[in-house]
Amino acid sequence: MIIAITGTPGVGKSTVSNLLFEKLKSGGKDIACINITEVVSKNGLYLEKDIEMDSYVVDFDKLNKYIQSVGTEDLILDGHVSHYLNPDYIIVLRANPLLIKNRLESRNYSSEKVKENVEAELLDVCLVESIEKNDESKIFEIDCSEKDPEKIVNEILMFLDLKNPEYGNISWLEDYFYLIE
């Protein structure tokens, strides 16, 4: 089972992925958690580095080979491109664009990178890409803005157990359109 935890940078993917990993591992599951950004950077699994946006253009062929070499069938893929890696389930984490803006600014992201990611959240980019690339029955979307990570993980576990997809209920455009003007 491969679980993709995707969403705009700053939404809480790593926090949720690590907590989900710990919960599944402590329950006896032989599972690994892969932080896509770290793996791509450390192992040169990219086509080029985008200097302006301080990010990598992922080489998906190399990344897929790396994932296959991990040695376990059960994986959590933590990253905003994880929905491109043919997962069994896709968890799309969402958060209030102002919360994302504040988190990214506290990480010293450039103003251009903050703006691009806030726009991506406003326009549902990770959700839309997930729907376009995958079977919609695999997708579960969660608003993480005001939820404790433990509650988010419990919702994910319930989705994995019941397999009832839920997405398309979160929209920030009406309240936060001014952020992209």
From Swiss-Prot:
GO terms for biological process: ribosomal small subunit biogenesis; rRNA processing. GO terms for molecular function: adenylate kinase activity; ATP binding; ATP hydrolysis activity. Residues 106-116 are annotated as: LID. It catalyses: AMP + ATP = 2 ADP; ATP + H2O = ADP + phosphate + H(+). Its EC number is 2.7.4.3. Broad-specificity nucleoside monophosphate (NMP) kinase that catalyzes the reversible transfer of the terminal phosphate group between nucleoside triphosphates and monophosphates. Also has ATPase activity. Involved in the late maturation steps of the 30S ribosomal particles, specifically 16S rRNA maturation. While NMP activity is not required for ribosome maturation, ATPase activity is. Associates transiently with small ribosomal subunit protein uS11. ATP hydrolysis breaks the interaction with uS11. This is Putative adenylate kinase. It comes from Methanococcus maripaludis (strain C7 / ATCC BAA-1331).
